[in-house]
């Protein structure tokens, strides 16, 4: 089966003296850090372009979706950016005179990644590269969660939502959408684990699933606090650094525990920086697609893009 050839230097690029083929932008630096060929085996099964059609190279398509996540673009905006922006073409290995995949092709590729369960495997491969590069420090895990609005309007009296898997969550049930639960590496700020659920799932429900097993310290806010969790972590040889919350026996925390909470809050500030980058710089404020599987894909791709961005910052 024929595969579209990309990344070949055209006459226009040759006349530019190679500036179109290489550069020193932040995207060029990011692209140079990642061993992209290690993703090729995972993506190899996505080459089928259908009867009578040339297939787009899977690596190029994957890199395009990472660009989308880095800059918070819609599928249509990504198509336009690939056509117009030289740095995007270089990153995706598209020549100046080559056609770009349209938004429907990009959407179908993402759907195939979801259908074949490849996104978790791609995330795991990037995680391995981060470990080999020595930037994943494993000094501990910081647990937290953030709400992200659904693409569809919420259900109202007599009218169901177009997204039946989204739910209301947050204080007073004010957000209709999904929740991204993350474990962030305490030493580097890199995302180690991410799980997406409907917004009404409690933070503590998936907390144990966020842990990888090699953590020495687990930090979290009071939403994750329970006597059983603290005891279990200690039994596993992990230091539970979970903020304490008042209970019916102790409605007000003593000064000692207030100071303890303050120390943990300061150490946990890095996870808030992670969410700020995802939402403010990468525009992960709204799910663009319908359903839990696609919401999870958008968040997982954003986590991969964030980790690549963070990798470049840590080694810059």
Please annotate each region the language model reported.
Residues 1-40, 311-316:
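Charged, often Cys/His-bearing segments associated with DNA-binding zinc-finger transcription factors
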Residues 20-71:
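Basic, short loop/linker segments at the boundary and entry of helix-turn-helix/winged-helix-like folds
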Residues 46, 61, 79-80, 90, ...:
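A detector of single, family-specific signature residues
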Residues 51-59, 172, 290-297:
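Structural motif
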Residues 53, 57, 76, 83, ...:
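Polybasic low-complexity intrinsically disordered regions
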Residues 216-217, 222-293, 300:
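Helix-centered, glycine/charged polyanion-binding patches within enzymatic domains
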Residues 286-316:
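C-terminal extensions of enzymes
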């Amino acid at each position: 089966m024929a595969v579209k050839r990309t990344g070949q230097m055209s006459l226009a690029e040759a006349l530019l003296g190679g500036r179109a083929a290489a550069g020193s932008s932040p995207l060029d630096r990011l692209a140079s850090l990642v061993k992209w060929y290690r993703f090729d085996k995972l993506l190899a099964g996505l080459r089928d372009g259908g009867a009578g059609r040339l297939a787009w190279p899977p690596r190029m398509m994957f890199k395009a979706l990472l660009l989308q996540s880095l800059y918070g673009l819609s599928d249509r905006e990504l198509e336009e950016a690939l056509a117009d922006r030289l740095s995007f073409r270089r990153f995706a290995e598209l020549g100046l005179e080559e056609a770009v995949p349209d938004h429907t092709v990009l959407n179908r590729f993402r759907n195939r990644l979801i259908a074949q369960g490849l996104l978790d495997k791609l995330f795991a491969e990037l995680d391995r590269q981060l470990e080999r590069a020595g930037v994943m420090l494993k000094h501990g895990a910081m647990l937290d969660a953030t709400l992200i609005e659904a693409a569809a309007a919420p259900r109202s009296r007599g009218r169901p939502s177009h997204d039946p898997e989204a739910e209301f969550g947050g204080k007073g049930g004010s957000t209709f959408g999904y929740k991204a639960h993350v474990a962030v590496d305490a030493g580097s700020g890199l995302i180690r684990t991410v799980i997406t659920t409907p917004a009404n799932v409690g933070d503590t429900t998936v907390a144990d699933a966020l842990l990888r097993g090699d953590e020495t310290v687990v930090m979290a806010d009071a939403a994750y606090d329970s006597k059983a969790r603290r005891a279990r972590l200690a039994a596993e040889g992990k230091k539970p650094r979970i903020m304490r919350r008042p209970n019916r026996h102790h409605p007000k925390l003593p000064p000692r525990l207030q100071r303890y909470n303050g120390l943990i809050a300061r150490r946990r500030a890095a996870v808030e920086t992670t969410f700020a980058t995802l939402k403010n710089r990468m525009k992960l404020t709204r799910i663009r697609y319908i359903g839990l599987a696609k919401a999870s894909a958008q968040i997982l791709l954003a986590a991969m893009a964030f980790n690549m961005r963070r990798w470049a910052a840590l080694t810059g």
